[in-house]
Amino acid sequence: MLQTPPDLPPVAEPVAEQVVEAVAPVPAPSPTIAVPGLDDSSLYIHRELSQLQFNIRVLEQALDENYPLLERLKFLLIFSSNLDEFFEIRVAGLKKQINFAREQAGADGLQPHQALARISELVHIEVERQYAILNDVLLPELEKHQIRFIRRRYWTPKLKTWVRRYFRDEIAPIITPIGLDPTHPFPLLVNKSLNFIVELEGVDAFGRDSGLAIIPAPRLLPRVIRVPEEVGGPGANYVFLSSMIHAHADDLFQGMKVKGCYQFRLTRNADLALDSEEVDDLARALRGELFSRRYGDAVRLEVADTCPKHLSDYLLKQFSLSESELYQVNGPVNLTRLFSITGLDSHPELQYTPFTPAIPKLLANADNIFSVISKQDILLMHPFESFTPVVDLLRQAAKDPHVLAVRQTLYRSGANSEIVDALVDAARNGKEVTAVIELRARFDEESNLQMASRLQAAGAVVIYGVVGFKTHAKMMLILRREQGEIVRYAHLGTGNYHAGNARLYTDYSLLTSDDALTEDVGKLFSQLIGMGKTLRMKKLLHAPFTLKKGMLDMIARETQFALEGKPAHIIAKFNSLTDAKVIKALYKASQSGVKIDLVVRGMCCLRPGIPGVSHNIQVRSIIGRFLEHTRVFYFLNGGEEQIYLSSADWMERNLDKRVETCFPVEGKKLLLRVKKELEGYLTDNTHAWTLQPDGRYVRSTPTGNQNPRSVQATLLERLSNPVLNVR
């Protein structure tokens, strides 16, 4: 039976379609209604609880039959992956506050121990629900398409023979069982690794009879093993590694009786404790921290739901965890390893229809990309439009004899990065290449260290950003000599220089040679690479200096327009809203009559729809095929509309503790284009969720005679080139 979380309705309730009108504020409430002050904790949603709500929306997609079946499975696995990181970072951070007696309530008023209690309650419900969806919905549906995960009770004699041989040849030689006794203490287990606790009976060759053993499963072993068709029958048949180990645990303890074998998985604190202000060599210090991350403090224990209480209690004691941190699951404890089967070539009908990102006509046949950009700005929206022009710009720069220098920020670039390849080529071809690499990009630290070493070996100058501030800005600057003068070309984006993400995330890219904007980009690079006072910018807003103030000023300007009785409208789209100062500014704007439409994919600590405070604010979240990642800010500005694109969300960490960029969209054509694309998010009635005043999200559905509208499908149709039956 599928359980419904307490903060979600049993069935998605239809929400009336929103019509985009710049001048339709909700009337102010009656003066008799008590209006809370803007510091009142009831006006704010706890950050971590809001993040959990986002993950619940992701899980809901696994039940949506409008998605192809393997994509629904993928959403369920993304839920697991997100939850892993949530415990590794967010839960670990709350526990750390408690352990160091540094409990401090946020704007919402919740103390860390109170938040942890609510998190535990909600996650227990959602994890049980997740496995129910897997076992009762997705696996039976997959079996109809001849994709099977064969449990032990359904093994045929032929399959048992094949499994025994596979276990003997491929698994047993690699596994190292550890018996527990005074000379064999409980092993130090790697974060998120698959392990088994085994209860034994009997005495071994040395007379030992401790009764317990641990089997760590090496990460090099696949978690799902495909069975040959001649053994398992037609279709794609799989056996879990855990099932193989359960079935043959006796073989690992010769002469002893296995009373029980149960899988478990430990999640540890994975946040790096490195303080960049207290180290002399950041790269060297980071390498040491990366190893210790695998063995941080325990924050969660997952065990098979068949595991007896005395064994789960034993494990909890070993890891100094409480019972509220124990999660019993009906299936594999490491679901993220199932990602390997979601791209089956044999079942394209169970996956999204492939598409080819478009290349604008201006660039499609251009021999010289610099000549195109010199005439006009080029705006790309990924993944509907290709990331290739960004790579091509850098490739041409690497080979162009007129290019003098290239400067580039890198936060996440992925393996086998074409961007990094082009930077290496540029350096080898004698260009002055400077790369500002953020070594502390979470979970990409090791990759970025390797990237830095490769660029240094090619002759590039590598800078590790600014001490105390992560460099999250996405910018490239190319200096080229033209007719005796140095001309600047720049790329600014809302997303990373990561070709893989550019096929999965929605992001904007701006290619420009605008004198003022490229000069600003050059100034920001100078600040990052050298030292000196903050430089005055002409067009660019940049954190941690002018971006937050600039956003607050623009919100205040709309507020003033509303107070003067003029139309006032803000549309903002980004990933997360947690900054209390920004939220208060939005509340004040709403109270003054500004119509505010927010499209916030993830965390949102603002409560919309509260009479007298946020009655003019609507918050939507779009969850669909592509991960929404664009940061777009629209201001009506008394009819002189302004739109900014940014690398930053409205979060304290982005606005106060990171190097970020925010740049204007200029020219009537581009301005109208981005506005139209932004408005599409306000009328989506298939993938939109609307935030309620009580913190719930309600899914939008077409009502009456409305046609289904998906903003992602519309953009895909309008901007890209669909390719059928091609992978």
UniProtKB/Swiss-Prot annotation:
Gene Ontology CC: polyphosphate kinase complex
Q: Which residues form the active site?
A: 472
Briefly state the modifications made to the protein after translation: An intermediate of this reaction is the autophosphorylated ppk in which a phosphate is covalently linked to a histidine residue through a N-P bond.
Report the coiled-coil segments. Answer: none
Please give one Gene Ontology molecular function term for this protein.
ATP binding
- Reactions performed catalytically: [phosphate](n) + ATP = [phosphate](n+1) + ADP
Keywords attached to this Swiss-Prot or TrEMBL record, sorted alphabetically, are: ATP-binding, Kinase, Magnesium, Metal-binding, Nucleotide-binding, Phosphoprotein, Transferase
Q: State the Gene Ontology BP annotations.
A: polyphosphate biosynthetic process
UniProt keyword Kinase present: yes
Residues annotated as binding ATP: 82, 505, 601, 629
Task: Specify whether Cell division is a keyword of the entry.
Answer: no
In this chain, Mg(2+) is annotated as bound at 412, 442
- Identify the InterPro entries for this entry: PP_kinase, PP_kinase_C_1, PP_kinase_middle, PP_kinase_middle_dom_sf, PPK_C_dom2, PPK_N_dom, PPK_N_dom_sf
The record's annotation in PANTHER family points to: POLYPHOSPHATE KINASE
Function, as annotated = Catalyzes the reversible transfer of the terminal phosphate of ATP to form a long-chain polyphosphate (polyP).
Q: Which HAMAP family does this chain map to?
A: Polyphosphate_kinase
Question: According to its UniProt record, which protein family does this protein belong to?
Answer: Belongs to the polyphosphate kinase 1 (PPK1) family.
What name goes with this protein?
A: Polyphosphate kinase
This protein's species is Pseudomonas putida (strain ATCC 47054 / DSM 6125 / CFBP 8728 / NCIMB 11950 / KT2440)
